[in-house]
């Protein structure tokens, strides 16, 4: 399982890459390994979202898994490439497999998330 050190992680297996007040969010390598081959991604709608709210889902041969907002803010972009090729989540969950981008309401929210070492300990 890969957990890049520059990201923040939720207990629901989402990752957050914060650059200024913009966060890119996806599901972790561990999550995609547990799900198996991703066949469909329900992408979130643009707009404001609260921390912890369900915003979409990932479907695989092993079942469905909800995606939750690990932080609050405004969803400003979705990865529409996943509609055509949801397997990007399996191939590269931290780059081409990102799910959405948001303008965070408070960048300090990431301090409530785990670092890579803590997340690796959670899933080991």
Where are these regions (language model features)?
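Poly-acidic low-complexity segments
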Residues: 77-79, 106
């Amino acid at each position: 399982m890969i957990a890049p050190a520059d990201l923040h992680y939720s207990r629901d297996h989402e990752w957050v890459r914060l650059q200024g007040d913009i966060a890119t969010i996806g599901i972790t390598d561990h999550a995609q390994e547990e799900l198996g081959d991703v066949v469909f991604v329900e992408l979130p709608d643009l707009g404001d979202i609260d921390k912890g709210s369900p915003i979409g889902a990932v479907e695989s041969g092993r079942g469905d898994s909800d995606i939750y907002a690990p932080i609050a803010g405004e969803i400003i972009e979705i990865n529409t490439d996943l509609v055509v090729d949801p397997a990007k989540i399996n191939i590269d969950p931290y780059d081409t497999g990102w799910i959405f981008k948001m303008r965070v309401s408070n960048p300090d929210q990431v301090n409530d998330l785990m670092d890579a070492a803590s997340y690796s300990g959670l899933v080991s």
